[in-house]
């Protein structure tokens, strides 16, 4: 009995020493830490918005952007904001998920789908809860419906394009990885900025969207890391019993 006990513990220790297990543990710990920070930051932002303390900041930033924006940016900003609409994101999501399944990246496909759908659902709920009206500081010739806080475009940008960037960065190596990361981050920021340029969101709306999506994304990643850990423990136990 003592021998069997020692063998089972040795098997678990070997599993814990495996690189994948350590990576999962690191991701889980990092996920919990980032989640805690994002929750705190989002709560602080909500408090500032609800109390009206962000009103002056929001107005100042929007008016500054409007007064310092050249007309030639209108076209690029409209294109950037179009990339955040569901009628563009959904087809791109379908293509990406199908492509990942075809190359055998099934878990990545699932994560991308859950990240995008969950972030979108979270945004809809938060918009309904806070019911913040959209800014009407200037007429940019562009209209948007529904509530303002948080920005759905910012959330979708991180939930879809951000998740896609993380997946590709994990799969790629060398310069290709950094190129994907730089382009992905630039696209997310560009979509968020386009909402300010067009005057349909306050800066705090966009910031809240950027925070809401990572909260869901990190939660999904932490859940995946925990699942890997549990699966590894079960596999180690199964190997022990099979002896």
PLM segments and residue spans:
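N-terminal transmembrane-helix/juxtamembrane module of multi-pass inner/ER membrane proteins
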Residues: 1-88, 128-142
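Hydrophobic alpha-helical transmembrane segments
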Residues: 26-30, 87-90, 109-114, 178-186, ...
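Alpha-helical membrane-inserting segments
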Residues: 38, 42, 46, 122, ...
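C-terminal ends of transmembrane alpha-helices
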Residues: 43-44, 124-134, 190-201
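Membrane-interface loops
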Residues: 50, 56, 92-93, 97-179
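Residue-level signal for helical boundary/lining positions with a hydrophobic bias
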Residues: 80-81, 127, 149, 201
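Membrane-embedded catalytic cores of phosphoryl/pyrophosphoryl-handling enzymes
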Residues: 137-243
């Amino acid at each position: 009995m003592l021998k069997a006990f020692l063998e089972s513990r040795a098997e678990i220790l070997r599993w814990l020493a495996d690189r994948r297990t350590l990576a999962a543990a690191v991701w889980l710990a990092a996920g919990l830490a980032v989640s805690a920070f994002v929750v705190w930051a989002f709560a602080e932002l909500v408090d500032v918005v609800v109390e009206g303390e962000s009103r002056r900041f929001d107005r100042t930033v929007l008016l500054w952007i409007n007064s310092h924006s050249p007309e030639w940016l209108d076209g690029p900003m409209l294109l950037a904001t179009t990339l955040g609409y569901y009628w563009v994101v959904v087809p791109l999501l379908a293509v990406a998920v199908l492509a990942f399944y075809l190359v055998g990246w099934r878990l990545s496909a699932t994560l991308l789908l859950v990240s995008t759908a969950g972030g979108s659902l979270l945004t809809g709920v938060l918009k309904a809860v806070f019911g913040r009206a959209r800014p009407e500081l200037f007429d940019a010739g562009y209209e948007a419906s529904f509530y303002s806080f948080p920005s759905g475009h910012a959330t979708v940008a991180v939930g879809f394009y951000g998740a896609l960037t993380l997946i590709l960065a994990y799969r790629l190596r060398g310069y290709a990885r950094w190129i994907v990361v730089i382009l992905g981050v630039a696209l997310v920021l560009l979509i968020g900025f386009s909402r300010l340029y067009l005057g349909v969101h306050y800066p705090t709306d966009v910031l809240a969207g950027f925070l809401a999506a990572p909260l869901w994304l990190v939660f999904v990643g932490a859940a995946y890391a925990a699942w890997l850990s549990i699966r590894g423990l079960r596999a180690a136990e199964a190997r022990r019993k099979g002896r």
